[in-house]
Amino acid sequence: MDPQDCTCAAGDSCSCAGSCKCKNCRCQSCRKSCCSCCPASCSNCAKGCVCKEPSSSKCSCCH
């Protein structure tokens, strides 16, 4: 199970797996993995984001 918080500093890359679901992840390289339909630049990612459809480019927190 993934940790609640990734251990890296904000903006740094980290070793989270592609399936990482860290809820408070601050890593630019990992953030996009917290919700597959969020863009990597989404600052709200991992805050209850829900993909609107499977394989969708839209999610509830960034669009």
Curated annotation (Swiss-Prot):
Q: Where is this region: Alpha?
A: 31-63
Residues involved in a divalent metal cation 6 binding: C38, C42, C45, C62
Name the positions where a divalent metal cation 3 binds.
C16, C20, C25, C30
Query: Where along this sequence does the record place binding of a divalent metal cation 4?
Result: C34, C35, C45, C49
Q: Name a GO molecular-function annotation.
A: zinc ion binding
Q: What positions does the entry give for a divalent metal cation 7 binding?
A: C51, C59, C61, C62
> Quick one: which residues bind a divalent metal cation 2?
C8, C14, C16, C27
- Give the Gene3D superfamilies listed for this entry: Metallothionein Isoform II
Q: Which residues does the record give as a divalent metal cation 5 binding sites?
A: C35, C37, C38, C51
Keyword Metal-binding (UniProt): yes
One Pfam family linked to the record: Metallothio
Question: Which InterPro entries has this protein been placed in?
Answer: Metalthion_dom_sf, Metalthion_dom_sf_vert, Metalthion_vert, Metalthion_vert_metal_BS
Question: One GO term of the cellular component aspect?
Answer: nucleus
Q: Which UniProt keywords apply?
A: Metal-binding, Metal-thiolate cluster
Positions contributing to a divalent metal cation 1 binding = C6, C8, C22, C25
Q: What does this protein do?
A: Metallothioneins have a high content of cysteine residues that bind various heavy metals.
Name the UniProt record assigns to this protein: Metallothionein-2
Natural source organism: Columba livia (Rock dove)
